[in-house]
Design a protein with these regions (language model features):
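Phosphate-centric recognition/catalysis
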Residues: 44-123
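Short, glycine/acidic-enriched capping/hinge loops at junctions between secondary-structure elements
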Residues: 29-34, 76-78, 131
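Intrinsically disordered, low-complexity, positively charged segments
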Residues: 17-53
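A residue-level signal for beta-strand positions that form part of recognition/binding surfaces
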Residues: 14-17, 33, 63, 97
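Conserved small/polar residues in nucleotide/adenosyl-binding loops
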Residues: 129, 133-135
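Conserved nucleotide-ligand handling architecture
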Residues: 1-19, 23-24
């Protein structure tokens, strides 16, 4: 079973979110926990098993993951792509979930007040230096 946490985030009722850890999961060997990345050399079947467990646990259809590029690239998530090369993504499609993977960078989850749009950001120093986030 994948370990996950809820944070105290005041979001509209139609927004679901969670934070998982690598503490448990279906991965093997040096990736023996809940690895969701095909970028590190793990058997893709184990990664797929971890992703499918998340989908089942939360009743999700499509999850779009970021292949973090340490850039200021922002893309719209869609069903056509399971992985996008970017450091921020968003969607207005209620059937798509956005996922950000981090190690030593900061994951940021965003929505607007009505919950019409969701997004996530991989906030590393390179992306921040390139003005990935504008406030």
């Amino acid at each position: 079973m994948i370990t996950e946490y809820k944070i105290n985030w005041a979001v509209p009722g139609n927004i679901g979110y969670f934070i998982s850890t690598s503490e448990t999961g279906n991965s093997k060997g040096k990736y023996k926990h809940a690895n969701f990345s095909n970028q590190v050399g793990e058997d893709s079947k184990n990664v797929e098993s971890n992703i499918n467990e998340l989908k089942t646990l939360h009743g999700l259809n499509d999850i779009t993951f970021m292949n973090q590029t340490h850039s200021n690239t922002v893309l719209e998530a869609s069903r056509e792509y399971a992985h996008l090369d970017c450091d921020a993504m968003f969607t207005e499609d209620k059937t798509i979930s956005c996922a950000v993977l981090t190690a030593d960078c900061i994951p940021i989850l965003v929505t607007e007040s009505s919950g019409r749009m969701i997004g996530c950001i991989h906030a590393g120093w390179r992306g921040l230096q390139l003005s990935l986030i504008h406030i």
